[in-house]
């Protein structure tokens, strides 16, 4: 049952094949069994069981709230959850109990979803590995998959060689990939949803900026943050998006226009569409496997009757440095509120003056990555530097936005790009570079989308020669999220990405292959 | 992209009639003259020509002072600028704080429509250019009563720019000449108020009250066109009246709804401007004038003694009447301004630009607000002068007290007495009684109708003016009697019987031959003495003019 998609399990609930409480308990038990993944910071067992009980009552009375009623979900630990600890994986917010729910959380709960827990991340979502949180790194479930174990070298199978999930929403990606929930919320500022989705073999969707409320999401970069969605298939993402999207009076950057329903056609059609391949995304660092899959994917579209053309996004090479300036500047500003006075950590060390209290609190509360970004951001915002850094970066951001505007204006419907440079790497490999370098490398294909506010989705495509997931990214026009997901659904159907085979879960019958997806996909190496 | 989203927060009341204006509170004594009391009072403290009074010594130039003001006015609104928390003065600490005001992570600002309307109206009333598009910025500094670590303000593109404020100043020995002056307005911006820190030095702790945090402020920045404390105080007073008339702010300085910072420098005319100091948090007009004049004099003295002026922030010690450097540990602040990313640009419309399909709740039309502007104080004064033939200074006096104009107009409506008489009674007798007991107009025991009835009796010559004063005093006791009742109870009616009066006059003439002799000798004071004697004999119930007429006839003058 747990291996099914959200839509499948939803219909099982409706037909009474399983009750919400049974489903909830199965997930809770799997969460316990996969504790070693460190995907969850908080497991909200009591809350989830209570919610399941209420959901069950509704089903019994024939008053189900809809597709999400009774569906176990997980939420990244940077979304505020009323009465449930929300830490951002930081000492600064350990023990912080928000008094309110983020709008997206509330909307899930209003539809009857069961909140299984809060998932792990890089501290304040600053990172691309889910390795830099105060609760330790998240382990990629594929490390323990039959596919990886069979194909990777012997030495890679030692316990110390576990793989990272990517980040910063690695906990949510791992939670969905390991079947502990049917959908999870992440956040995406520079790729934080799409990157771990690619490494964990899930769908990872970043909606258009302004489509989904950020109220209650503890911000990284307000002008780029969006709540992201992890699911095991594109249809499931559309279901969740349908619940989350729409104007929120508490977030003035959400659009007022009424949101159309996000049901995708059962037989999506991409013939007649124009698929753009940005030539700047073909970089030397791109792994040959991904490069080859990218090219095969383009062929698939062409074979279906889509027009595939090379397009030019000329300012792409300036994007990452521009992102760095804008990101750290907003970080410096957003982190100013963590001063130990109103909530969160307060240093017990030095109480001689308010300034000393601030300094000690912030020294103890933040990790080096956060502190580093605060320092650079404040540097860029200094009066003497503002024009040269912040304003210039904003101008470059405009150029990058215009690149996309021009491409989409020229008739391109969707862009097809890689999501990451490589497959997931072992933790020991990953930490050889610092967070800043890693973020710059890992966000290379993803952050420009955030600067432009466009919708984008990672679709898992195939397993690498080592048996690890590889994803490709589709980027759509602003607010054409439904069109993007339709294309993604068609693409997903073509590639037939294999289901992860987690040995210990297979053994106890939690995961019985049910839809024949365990066969290799059409895009294999 | 996203449209600006506005909340509705309607004002508690449009007119601040019930509030007692602080400067009238500060006034004391019952010397109520016909001109603006404010100006008169100021003249005793402000020494307007202080700096020019410096007699230039040999080889020296005169000094000129340059004063600019930044005025923060709390917007009169039910809720805060970016949150739904209520706005209310003197509520229990931290009882009016939303999650946003406490800067809980993940909360976002939502702009209050009412605050925007107040800002546009203030901009229009102050002859500003209203920017159809304005932006919000973050201004960063760490302070315990600023929970987010930044204030949202309008640094780059404020809602209104380039206006002017006309105010009046009194010249001449008796301040009887009124001249108008103009100060340019650089800009008006919307911004958040901070919370309040209360330092408990004994226990060395700081208590924080966030009730004020996030209340909408209008920051009005005046160009440095002022030259002394009196000018500054008069300009601020006029601004205060305008904001109150608009209902944009209650602008009560004693309650901190209007706070003024002054930038002050001195230089020799024709030479470059001097280094300026900033005097912060002046919370009464009297202290504003005092602080500015003290600071001007301090700078002149400093420079003449070969010292230099530091670009620093000073505070005014009202007990000692001087300005002192403020302790500023951080030294020069770099506020690291940054665009507020959570608020789209604030877009305003006019009649021609309102999009046809726009949600009316999301549209603010400048033209519509212009149509809604109430009569402004300057126009009211002009109207009073035109309509009632009033002296300009009387029109100032009527507007200078909260509620006094309304009181005056209500008396006018109900009485047959001449407007001039009403003006005199309201500004002299009535206001004098209020001041004496330190009461606001709204607290007066005498209603406009009661005064109107009294003035009718006076107008119809039923009572003398001295009897009228007596009746007014009775009315003030507030025992519920009407003027007519008091007159009849105390037998204060004038003797209408001319024969009886003639008899009284005859008797007085006969009883005071010496005075009569003086009258015949053309001693000008004698006739008045005789009139006085008759009045006394009539127990003040005779009309002096009539007595004089009869006496003159009898003595065949």
Swiss-Prot record, chain A:
Subunit of the heterotrimeric GatCAB amidotransferase (AdT) complex, composed of A (QRSL1), B (GATB) and C (GATC) subunits. Its EC number is 6.3.5.7. It catalyses: L-glutamyl-tRNA(Gln) + L-glutamine + ATP + H2O = L-glutaminyl-tRNA(Gln) + L-glutamate + ADP + phosphate + H(+). Keywords: ATP-binding, Ligase, Mitochondrion, Nucleotide-binding, Protein biosynthesis. Belongs to the amidase family. GatA subfamily. One of its GO terms (biological process) is mitochondrial translation. The keyword Signal does not apply. One of its GO terms (cellular component) is glutamyl-tRNA(Gln) amidotransferase complex. It comes from the Eukaryota. Its main location: mitochondrion. It is found in: Mitochondrion. This is Glutamyl-tRNA(Gln) amidotransferase subunit A, mitochondrial. GO terms for molecular function: ATP binding; glutaminyl-tRNA synthase (glutamine-hydrolyzing) activity. The keyword Ligase applies. It is an enzyme of class 6 (ligase). Signal peptide: none annotated. HAMAP family: GatA. Allows the formation of correctly charged Gln-tRNA(Gln) through the transamidation of misacylated Glu-tRNA(Gln) in the mitochondria. The reaction takes place in the presence of glutamine and ATP through an activated gamma-phospho-Glu-tRNA(Gln). It holds the Pfam family Amidase. It comes from Rattus norvegicus. The gene is Qrsl1. Transmembrane segments: none annotated. SUPFAM superfamilies: Amidase signature (AS) enzymes. The active site is at residues 76, 168, 192.
């Amino acid at each position: 049952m747990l291996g099914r998609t959200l839509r499948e399990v939803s219909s099982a609930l409706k037909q009474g094949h399983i009750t919400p409480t049974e489903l909830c308990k199965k997930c809770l038990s799997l969460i316990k069994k996969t504790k070693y993944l460190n995907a969850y910071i908080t497991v909200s067992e009591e809350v989830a069981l209570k919610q399941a009980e209420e959901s069950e009552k509704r089903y019994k009375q024939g008053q189900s709230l809809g597709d999400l009623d009774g569906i176990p979900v997980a939420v990244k630990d940077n979304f505020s959850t009323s009465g449930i600890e929300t830490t951002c994986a930081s000492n600064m917010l350990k023990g912080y109990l928000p008094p309110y729910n983020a709008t997206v959380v509330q909307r899930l709960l209003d539809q009857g979803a069961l909140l299984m827990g809060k998932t792990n991340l890089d501290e304040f979502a600053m990172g691309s590995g889910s390795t830099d949180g105060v609760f330790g790194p998240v382990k990629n479930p594929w490390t323990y998959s039959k596919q990886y174990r069979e194909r990777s070298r012997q030495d890679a199978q030692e316990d110390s060689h576990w793989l990272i999930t990517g980040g910063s929403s690695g906990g949510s990606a791992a939670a969905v990939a390991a079947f502990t929930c049917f959908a999870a919320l992440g956040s995406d500022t520079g790729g934080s949803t799409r990157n771990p989705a690619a490494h964990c073999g899930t769908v990872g969707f970043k909606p258009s900026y302004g489509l989904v409320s950020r109220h209650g999401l503890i911000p990284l970069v307000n002008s780029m943050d969006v709540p992201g969605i992890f699911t095991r298939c594109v249809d499931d993402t559309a279901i969740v998006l349908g619940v989350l999207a729409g104007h929120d009076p508490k977030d003035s950057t959400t659009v007022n226009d009424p949101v159309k329903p996000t049901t995708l056609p059962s037989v999506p059609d991409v013939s007649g569409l124009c698929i753009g391949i940005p030539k700047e995304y073909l970089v030397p660092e791109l792994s040959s496997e991904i490069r080859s899959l990218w090219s095969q994917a383009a062929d698939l579209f062409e074979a279906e009757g889509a027009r595939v053309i090379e397009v030019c996004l000329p300012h792409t090479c300036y994007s990452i440095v521009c992102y760095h300036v804008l990101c750290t500047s907003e970080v410096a500003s957003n982190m100013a509120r963590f001063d130990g006075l109103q909530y969160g950590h307060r240093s017990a060390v030095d109480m001689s003056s308010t300034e000393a209290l601030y300094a000690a609190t912030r020294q103890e509360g933040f990790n080096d990555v956060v502190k580093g970004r605060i320092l650079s951001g404040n540097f860029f915002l200094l009066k003497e530097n503002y024009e040269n850094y912040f304003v210039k970066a904003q101008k470059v951001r405009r150029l990058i936005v215009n690149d996309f505007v021009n491409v989409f204006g020229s008739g391109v419907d969707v862009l097809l790009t890689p999501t990451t440079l490589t497959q997931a790497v072992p933790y020991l490999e990953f930490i050889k570079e610092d967070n800043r370098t890693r973020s710059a490398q890992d966000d290379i294909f993803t952050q420009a989308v955030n600067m432009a506010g466009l919708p984008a989705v990672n679709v898992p495509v195939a397993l690498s020669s080592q048996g690890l997931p590889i994803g490709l990214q589709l980027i759509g026009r602003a607010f054409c999220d439904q069109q993007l997901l339709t294309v993604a659904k068609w693409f997903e159907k073509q590639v037939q990405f294999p289901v992860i085979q987690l040995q210990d879960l297979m053994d106890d019958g939690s995961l019985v292959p049910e839809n024949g997806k365990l066969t290799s996909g059409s895009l294999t190496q | 992209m996203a449209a600006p989203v506005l909340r509705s927060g309607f004002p508690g009341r449009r007119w601040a009639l019930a509030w007692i204006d602080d400067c009238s509170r500060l006034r004391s004594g019952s010397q109520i003259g016909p001109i603006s009391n404010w100006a008169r009072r100021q003249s005793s403290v402000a020494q307007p020509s202080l700096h020019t009074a410096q007699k230039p010594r040999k080889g020296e130039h005169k000094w000129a002072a340059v004063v600019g003001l930044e005025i923060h006015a709390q917007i009169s609104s039910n809720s805060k600028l970016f949150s739904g928390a209520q706005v209310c003065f003197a509520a229990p600490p931290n009882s009016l704080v939303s999650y946003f005001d406490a800067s809980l992570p993940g909360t976002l600002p939502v702009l209050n429509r009412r605050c925007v309307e107040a800002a546009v109206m203030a901009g229009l009333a102050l002859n500003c250019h209203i920017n159809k598009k304005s932006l919000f910025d973050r201004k960063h500094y760490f302070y315990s009563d600023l929970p987010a670590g930044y204030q949202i303000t309008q640094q780059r593109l404020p809602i209104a720019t380039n206006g002017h404020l006309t105010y009046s100043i009194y010249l001449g020995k008796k301040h009887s000449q009124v001249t108008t002056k103009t100060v340019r307005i650089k800009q008006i911006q919307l911004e958040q108020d901070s919370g309040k820190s209360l330092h408990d030095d004994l226990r060395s702790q700081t208590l924080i009250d966030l009730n004020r945090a996030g209340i909408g402020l209008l920051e009005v920045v005046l160009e440095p066109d002022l030259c002394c404390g009196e000018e500054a105080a008069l300009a601020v007073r006029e601004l205060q009246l305008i904001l109150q008339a608009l209902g944009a702010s209650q602008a009560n300085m004693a309650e901190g709804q209007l706070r003024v910072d002054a930038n002050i420098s001195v230089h020799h005319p024709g030479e470059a401007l001097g280094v300026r100091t900033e005097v912060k948090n002046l919370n009464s007009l009297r202290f504003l004038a005092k602080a500015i004049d003290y600071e001007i004099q301090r700078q002149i003295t400093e420079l003449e003694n070969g010292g230099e002026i530091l670009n620093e922030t000073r505070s005014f010690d009202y007990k000692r009447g001087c300005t002192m450097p403020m302790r500023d540990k951080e030294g020069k602040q770099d506020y690291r301004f940054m665009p507020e990313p959570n608020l789209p640009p604030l877009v305003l419309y006019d009649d021609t630009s309102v999009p046809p399909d726009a949600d009316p709740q999301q549209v603010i039309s400048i033209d519509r607000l212009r149509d809604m502007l109430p009569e402004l104080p300057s126009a009211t004064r002009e109207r009073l002068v035109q309509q009632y033939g009033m002296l300009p200074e009387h029109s100032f006096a009527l507007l200078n007290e909260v509620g006094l104009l309304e009181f005056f107009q209500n008396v006018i409506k109900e009485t047959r007495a001449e407007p001039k008489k009403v003006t005199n009674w309201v500004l002299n007798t009535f206001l004098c009684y209020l001041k004496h007991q330190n009461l606001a107009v709204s607290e007066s025991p005498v209603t406009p109708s009661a005064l109107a009835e009294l003035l009718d009796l006076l107008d119809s010559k039923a009572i003398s003016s001295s009897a009228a004063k007596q009746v007014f005093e009775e009315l003030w006791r507030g025992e519920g009697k009407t003027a007519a009742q008091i007159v009849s109870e105390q037998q204060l009616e004038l003797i209408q019987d001319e024969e009886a009066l003639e008899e009284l006059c005859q008797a007085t003439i006969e009883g005071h031959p010496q005075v009569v002799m003086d009258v015949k000798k053309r001693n000008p004071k004698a006739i008045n003495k005789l009139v006085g004697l008759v009045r006394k004999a009539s127990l003040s119930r005779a009309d002096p003019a009539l007595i004089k007429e009869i006496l003159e006839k009898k003595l065949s003058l």
